[in-house]
Every structure is written in structure tokens, then in C-alpha cells.
Amino acid sequence: MFENKPDDSPVYLATASHDQTIRLWQARTGRCYFSFRYPDLHVNRLELTPEKGKLVAACNPHIRLFDLRSYNPHIPVRNFVSHTKNVMAVGFQYTGHMMYSGSEDGSVKIWDLRVRECQREFRSVSPVNTVVLHPNQTELISGDQNGNIRVWDLRADLCSCELVPEVGTPIRSLTVMWDGTMVVAANDRGTCYVWRSLCERQTMTEFEPLHKLQAHNSHILKCLLSPGNNRYLATASSDKTVKIWNLDGFKLEKVLTGHERWVWDCDFSMDGEYLVTASSDTTARLWSMRAGKEEMVYQAHRKATVCCTLLRD
């Protein structure tokens, strides 16, 4: 069950698979230093909390928090129970006190980690596939199965803006530029819609259409803007590839090939120099952004690897 004690190796990469295991790896060496089974869970998303050593798994239908530095890291230290269907998105405010989640039950929920309870709830008409927090820390942006993108104002407790790029085409993934100036939405037709985000301190955020990018000919399962000054957009697709787009003109910079099945998830390193991906071919892979080449293959899962997250220290 455990391949090593978690104390002697910091967490660099976490992956979850349909084989009902969560694995933790050293990103540089490719060594899986421990794993644990979760036979009663279906994990859709993994996130490391702002508090070091803790991992959150968005499951069906609950959210579970694991303390990776405890003597029993496989036993959840907290269970967040309120959603009634698959939890598809989870994330945190930078202070670490507030957690947000989005679910196929059509809700976006706000949790206070100090009291373990759902504090607020926003309702969407259809299943929620993706939720991101704007860098201003006061707005959540959600995308749903009917193609709606909604901005939820946490100060006013209301939907302040709604965008519908393609009626009826599911929004699969959302990403926001680190400085809040750009928002990208990816859908099931392989299209990315890009807006310039106009932020005013005293008013709500406004969105100005900037670009429409036909990135793939099939589902985009994850889109992600790079951190810092690296101006790239990564799109992971059911066509087995990950494409890297230069934001200056939205030109195709690189195509990362090597996965043999759908690529479900991706995550940039903190400096934007590397990208990790998760695929139905059971592997996770590490890529160099400069070379556009595969640096490492993480292979131990027996079924599809559906989500991955890199430690941001």
C-alpha cells in the first residue's frame, strides 16, 4: 500500500487514476514514493492546499482532505459533504481559509475550512464542469454543460456577468491569467474563446472578446495559462496531444506528442518551464517547455490517469 514514508520526500506531483489509487511522485526522478487506495471514491480533480502537505480530492459526490504528513495519510482528515453528484472542480483562496467547488449537481459552493461547512451556494441551471477563482480573490468563474460561463461576485453574492460563446456546447475548462487580464474558455468542439478581462476596483470585472481559437478538432479537456511572464496557453485534448500556443498572436508554438490516449489534465510548474500531463494511457508525463520534449514518464497506475497537480511551494 505504501512504498515509503512520506516524511523523507517532499511532495512534487500527485496523480489520481481510475485504478482507485492516488500516487505521489518526485517529479525530477520519476520515483513514486507512496500511494494509497480509495476504493469508495471516484476522483475528478486533485489540488494541493496553500497549507503544505495537504491534498484535496474532488470526488463523487464528496470532497476529501488528506494530510500527507500524518501517520495515516490515506485516511481523510476531513470530509466535505453537501454536493449530491460528481464534484468537478475545487480550489482555494490564497489565504487557504476558503475553498470553492463546482459539481454536476449544478451548484458552486464556498467552504470555510476552519469550520468544515458550506457557507454559501450559487446555483447554475445545468451541471458545472469547471470553476476558477479570479486573481482579485472576489470573483468565481464557472462553466457548465449548457455552454454558459457565469461570474459570481463573492462580495455581492450574485451572478454579475454571463457569457455564452456557443449555445449548448459544454464548457469543459476555464483558466485565468495570473494578473487577471485574460480569461480563456475551452469547449467540447475543440474551440478556445479568449476575453480581455477589464478589472476596475469599484465595479465588477468586464469582459471584452479578444480571440477565437480552433485549437483541436475534438474535445479540449483542459486549458491552462502559464504562470509569470511565460505567455503560453496549453490545451490538452482527446486527440492525444497537448498544444502550446503563444499568446502573442495565438500562434501554435509546439505540439506535445507521446500520449497514446486522451489527455485529461495538465499543470505548469511554478516557473512555467515545465508542464505535467495525465492521460488515459495510464501515464503522467513531464515536458520541457523550451525543448517541447518529454522529460519523464510516471508509470505505475494500471488504468487511466485522470488528474495531476504539481506542488507550488
From Swiss-Prot:
It comes from the Eukaryota. The keyword Transcription regulation does not apply. WD repeats lie at residues 1-35, 38-76, 82-121, 123-162, 166-205, 215-255, 258-297. One of its GO terms (cellular component) is TORC2 complex. InterPro entries: G-protein_beta_WD-40_rep, MLST8, WD40/YVTN_repeat-like_dom_sf, WD40_repeat_CS, WD40_repeat_dom_sf, WD40_rpt. PANTHER family: G BETA-LIKE PROTEIN GBL, TARGET OF RAPAMYCIN COMPLEX SUBUNIT LST8. The existence of a second LST8 copy gene is specific to Arabidopsis and could be the result of a recent duplication. The expression of this duplicated gene (At2g22040) could not be detected experimentally. Could be a non-functional gene. This is Non-functional target of rapamycin complex subunit LST8-2. It comes from Arabidopsis thaliana (Mouse-ear cress).
